[in-house]
Every structure is written in structure tokens, then in C-alpha cells.
């Protein structure tokens, strides 16, 4: 009787569900300009960078990493000048078509980060939670 072999090839389908994030996204409101860029680093990881400028002065910048480990998808954020530049990891708690929510209930603020893609040429991102 032939023995069954376990496939060593991992599937990253849960991360692939977020492929709509990949690209360059910009927003201008008055004198404020924001840009977020996502690229596919490999099968299990997307990397991102986001910044906001007001009158050409960078007032916010962060590195982002989306990764799938086993069946979980994690969003790790390093917001420069916050949390001593320590990476903070959020776990995906829900995914709908073109929407994802990540949560870390132990973080002071935010506890949730939400991404949506309302149309093919835009994404929306916001944070939620209590200020501890």
C-alpha cells in the first residue's frame, strides 16, 4: 500500500485575498498629501510604506508588513516616532471582499486597523479603538 506524502508546498491563499492592496495609493486634501505603497515581497509577505506630508514636511511615516503564517494573516506596523519605533503586530480578524480588519486588543491605540477598496482605483484605511 503506498504511503501518503504530505505536501511541503504551502498555500498562501489568505494573503492572496489581500492582493488588491498591491499598488501605489495617493490622496491630497488641501495642503496634506498622503501616499501608501504595497509590493509583493514573496508568496507569504507583502511590504508597504506610508507617509503623510503637510506643506512638504513629513508629519507621519510608517513601514508595513503583511505576512501569512499557517492560517493567520498579520499586519506589522512600525510608525516612526511612536512606540519607540517598535513593531506592533495586528492579527486579521475579518476579511470580506475588498475589506480587511486587523486587531491587537493589547495595543494602547489603535486596537484595530481597517482597509477597504470601495472602487478599483482607491483604498481607504483607518484606525479604531479606545485611547488607553
Region annotations inferred by a language model:
Residues 114-118, 124-132:
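Short, exposed beta-strand-loop hairpins at the edges of beta-sheets
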Residues 9-24, 68:
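N-terminal helix-cap/turn-to-beta initiation motif at the start of protein domains
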Residues 1-9:
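Bacterial Sec-dependent N-terminal signal peptides
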Residues 4, 16-17, 39-41, 132:
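Amphipathic alpha-helical hairpins
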Residues 27-28, 33-106:
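Central antiparallel beta-sheet cores of small beta-barrel/beta-sandwich binding domains
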Residues 43, 120-121:
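Short, conserved beta-turn/loop elements at beta-strand boundaries and strand-helix junctions
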Amino acid at each position: 500500500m503506498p504511503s501518503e506524502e504530505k505536501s511541503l508546498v504551502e498555500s498562501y491563499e489568505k494573503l492572496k485575498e489581500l492582493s488588491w492592496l498591491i499598488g501605489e495609493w495617493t490622496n491630497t486634501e488641501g495642503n496634506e498629501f498622503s501616499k501608501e505603497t504595497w509590493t509583493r515581497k514573496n508568496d507569504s509577505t507583502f511590504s508597504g510604506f506610508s507617509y503623510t506630508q503637510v506643506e512638504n514636511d513629513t508629519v507621519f511615516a510608517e513601514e508595513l508588513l503583511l505576512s501569512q503564517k499557517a492560517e493567520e494573516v498579520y499586519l506589522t506596523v512600525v510608525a516612526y516616532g511612536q512606540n519607540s519605533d517598535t513593531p506592533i503586530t495586528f492579527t486579521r480578524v475579518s476579511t470580506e471582499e475588498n475589506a480587511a480588519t486587523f486587531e491587537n486588543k493589547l495595543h494602547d491605540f489603535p486596537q484595530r486597523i481597517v482597509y477597504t477598496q470601495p472602487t478599483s482605483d482607491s483604498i481607504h484605511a483607518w484606525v479604531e479603538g479606545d485611547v488607553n
